[in-house]
């Protein structure tokens, strides 16, 4: 089972709000998911992002692949550098 970390669209028409979910790659975008690991609100001036770092690092270490947008959000939050350091420090 290929697992991805990707965005799920929530909110109403013209006012998107996203959840950062861990889901099977074959599941629909807004369909079944395994776990919610964060949120992303692009409408706020500073693009409010909340991330459960421990859970994201655990899923990345298990082999979950982030989507391009999620990878950018994780990089800006500093999670990808922590994952890189954790992976190559051994």
Curated annotation (Swiss-Prot):
Belongs to the bacterial ribosomal protein bS16 family. This is Small ribosomal subunit protein bS16. InterPro entries: Ribosomal_bS16 (IPR000307), Ribosomal_bS16_dom_sf (IPR023803). Coiled coil: none annotated. It comes from Streptococcus agalactiae serotype V (strain ATCC BAA-611 / 2603 V/R). The lineage of its organism: Bacteria, Bacillati, Bacillota, Bacilli, Lactobacillales. The keyword DNA damage does not apply. NCBIfam families: S16 (TIGR00002). The keyword Ribonucleoprotein applies. One of its GO terms (cellular component) is small ribosomal subunit. One of its GO terms (biological process) is translation. GO terms for molecular function: structural constituent of ribosome. The gene is rpsP. Keywords: Ribonucleoprotein, Ribosomal protein.
């Amino acid at each position: 089972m290929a697992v991805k970390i990707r965005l799920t669209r929530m909110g109403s028409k013209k006012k998107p709000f996203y959840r950062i979910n861990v889901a099977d790659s074959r599941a629909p975008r807004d369909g079944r998911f395994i776990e919610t690991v964060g949120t992303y609100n692009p409408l706020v001036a500073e693009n409010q992002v909340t991330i459960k770092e421990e859970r994201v690092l655990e899923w990345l270490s298990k082999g979950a692949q982030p989507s391009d947008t999620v990878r950018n959000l994780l990089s800006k939050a500093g999670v990808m550098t922590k994952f890189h350091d954790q992976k190559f420090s051994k």
